């Protein structure tokens, strides 16, 4: 996995959904699409709607599924063009290198990758030569480059989405260890 200038001992950040809080409203999907398309409302049409996360609804539960920014990311490991890299404590797609081969979609264990087709302008010597279709891999990029951070987190009406980083993960681990220690201590008899 190519590392774009990150330290070796850092953990990738990721967003996780709490299915106990998710109501399946899809507000996160809408916020994602708007955040990645400059707030243009025409991207909310059925033909153009391509969120980088997906709300999955079951009979009794709903939750958002998105990229977990794996440390040893299967999508990056199989990319034949080196278009998926580790950068800014996350896994990012370099669209200029992506050839839309869908290998990453097959490799992702979470179903968090998709390939979308976009119309792009073809330029030659600074002049437009028209438009063509380009397929490109898409996944959660943690709204990288947006000062407000991930749009999905800030709009969730039930606060079901949370950013997990190294500190949060360590705090969760300590809490679980303490709970396990107390549970075991309560059941001991000598």
Give, region by region, the residue ranges found by the protein language model.
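Protein kinase-like catalytic domain
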Residues: 33-36, 80, 109
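Core segments of cupin and vicinal oxygen chelate
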Residues: 27-43
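Conserved active-site region of classical short-chain dehydrogenase/reductase
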Residues: 23-26, 102
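N-terminal "mature ectodomain cap" immediately after the signal peptide
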Residues: 15-20, 27
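Hydrophobic face of beta-strands forming the core of extended beta-sheets/solenoids
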Residues: 17, 93-94
